[in-house]
Amino acid sequence: LLHILVARAQDEPAQESACPAIVKRAAWGAAKSKNVTYQLKPVANVIVHHTTGERCATVATCKEMVANIQTYHQTDNRWSDIGYNFLISGQNVYEGIGWHRMGAHLRGYNDKSIGVAFLGNFDQERPTPRSLNLLARLLQCGVELGELADDYRLYGARQLQSTNSPGRYLYAKLQELDHWQAQ
């Protein structure tokens, strides 16, 4: 009977996860968080930002950029950690504070959303198809893991606060994605 179950399991196709590879905090040299506040899950809102700086071209420069953002948030803003849950470059997803932790990305929404920042200035540059695909896969992954509600709502930061973020080009592309909320 055991042989039959093993043979049957080997014949069934493996379910592929939507989860993209995520560059973990240790890999980009994250400093220790000064405090962690957990969120209730599943989270109902996703808010997309851009960092407004240069776009990073290599994994090494992207890691350095993410570490610099964390340093700025902890030192200049006096936050407990990097404000974003995740950051996306043209090639990779970087873990900010990660799933089920409250960020510091948009006042009034931090306790009911996750914040995803695209590295670069998307008032000047267009997001790559790969980076948009990484966002879609990350969000689907969040649903699969139970971190995001099945009916989560997707926003650009400019819809909820007076800001240009996530930049006009990224904002236009977000409107083509599932779960987009016109508001």
Task: Outline where the language-model segments fall.
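Basic/polar, cationic surfaces and motifs that engage anionic cell-wall
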Residues: L1-T51, G90-Q183
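Alpha-helix termini
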Residues: D76-N77, G146
